[in-house]
């Protein structure tokens, strides 16, 4: 697994857990990584670069949540965000953050990573659901955003 994939998966787990327990996402991310290393600071069990990328993603999503959710709501025809599975919604949030605020990551890489994470963590139809909405959003994102 690549460092960035590991970071995306950690970020997803932190955002999902934040939704469930209404706790600060950074605290949740730290707690998740500590559970891998039995209460210590993140060690070899969690790659430090993956942790840093996950932290960047979590902070980016939390800081820009209103704009990100607005884009998702705008393009998710016939789906209110309240009806979306929390896993799918948080995968979308992470990917939309990358599309809007990380122009150094190619759109096709962001989309492919989101689809792969959806296959691993989501329901049977999550990958196609995520792909459909991200395709709509990606087509409206300019390189200047």
Curated annotation (Swiss-Prot):
Biological role: Involved in transcription antitermination. Required for transcription of ribosomal RNA (rRNA) genes. Binds specifically to the boxA antiterminator sequence of the ribosomal RNA (rrn) operons.
Any one Pfam family match given in the protein's UniProt record, by short name: NusB
GO CC, any one term: cytosol
Family: Belongs to the NusB family.
Superkingdom assignment: Bacteria
One BP annotation, GO: DNA-templated transcription termination
HAMAP family on file: NusB
Gene Ontology molecular function: any one: RNA binding
Naturally occurring in which organism (per UniProt): Geobacter sp. (strain M21)
Protein's recorded name: Transcription antitermination protein NusB
Alphabetical list of InterPro entries matching this protein: NusB-like_sf, NusB_fam, NusB_RsmB_TIM44
Keyword Transcription regulation: yes
Keywords on record: RNA-binding, Transcription, Transcription antitermination, Transcription regulation
Keyword Transcription regulation: yes
């Amino acid at each position: 697994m690549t460092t960035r994939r590991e970071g995306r998966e950690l970020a997803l787990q932190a955002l999902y857990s934040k939704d469930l327990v209404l706790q600060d996402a950074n605290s949740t991310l730290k707690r998740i990584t500590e559970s891998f290393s039995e209460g210590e600071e993140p060690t070899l069990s969690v790659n430090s670069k993956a942790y840093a990328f996950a932290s960047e993603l979590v902070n980016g999503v939390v800081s820009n949540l209103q704009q990100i959710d607005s884009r998702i709501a705008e393009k998710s025809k016939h789906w209110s965000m309240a009806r979306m599975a929390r896993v799918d919604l948080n995968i979308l949030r992470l990917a939309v953050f990358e599309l809007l605020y990380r122009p150094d990551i190619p759109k096709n890489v962001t989309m492919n990573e989101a689809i792969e994470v959806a296959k691993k963590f989501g329901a049977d139809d999550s990958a196609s659901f995520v792909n459909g909405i991200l395709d709509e959003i990606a087509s409206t994102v300019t390189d200047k955003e």
